[in-house]
């Protein structure tokens, strides 16, 4: 009798296991497609300054990536080595149309994306690690400021 109940429970659970695996594969394929097509938005949820504690971001901060433009609207917390020429502009708020975009796969199935703006003096480069489940982390290296990291997720651009 015990074996019959175990068999019934196993038959009920098996379709759910298969669906979960298919859903994971579909999400990975979708993330791969938007990364390779350069058509996505990185939504920052946590800022991790070099010095100090992490900060949860409550506003809609992000980095929009398309084939011809990168638009950054990210906050900065940290130390600046030189004073900005225009203090009303944020250090990570810029739009660039001239940039290098390099993508490579990493060992765990995700992607490493390096964006190097060429028509903006600061930041120097943005290095993003995108995981196959859609979560991502980004490090912003700057000439005149301490590096800062962000954790968040990647989604298709609307």
Where are these regions (language model features)?
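Bacterial Sec-dependent N-terminal signal peptides
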Residues: 1-26
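A broadly conserved detector of short glycine/acidic/proline-rich loop/turn motifs that flank catalytic sites
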Residues: 10, 46, 76, 117, ...
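Short, solvent-exposed secondary-structure boundary motifs
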Residues: 22-23, 48-57, 85-95, 114-121
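N-terminal secretory signal peptides
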Residues: 23-84
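Mature extracytoplasmic domains of secretory-pathway proteins
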Residues: 64-110
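Helix-rich interaction surfaces within compact, conserved domain-sized segments
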Residues: 94-158
């Amino acid at each position: 009798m015990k074996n019959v109940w175990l068999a019934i429970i196993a038959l009920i659970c098996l379709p759910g296991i298969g669906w979960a695996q298919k859903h994971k594969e579909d999400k990975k394929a979708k993330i791969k497609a938007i990364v390779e097509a350069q058509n996505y938005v990185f939504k920052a949820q946590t800022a991790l300054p070099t010095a100090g504690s992490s900060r949860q971001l409550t506003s809609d901060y992000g980095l929009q990536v398309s084939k011809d433009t990168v638009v950054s609207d990210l906050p900065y917390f940290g130390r600046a080595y030189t004073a900005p020429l225009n203090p009303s502009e944020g250090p990570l708020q810029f739009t660039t149309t001239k940039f290098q975009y390099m993508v490579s796969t990493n060992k765990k199935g995700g992607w490493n994306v390096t964006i190097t703006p060429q028509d903006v003096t600061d930041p120097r480069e943005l290095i993003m690690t995108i995981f196959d489940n859609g979560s991502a982390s980004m490090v912003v290296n700057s000439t005149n400021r301490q590096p800062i990291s962000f954790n968040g997720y990647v989604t298709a651009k609307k």
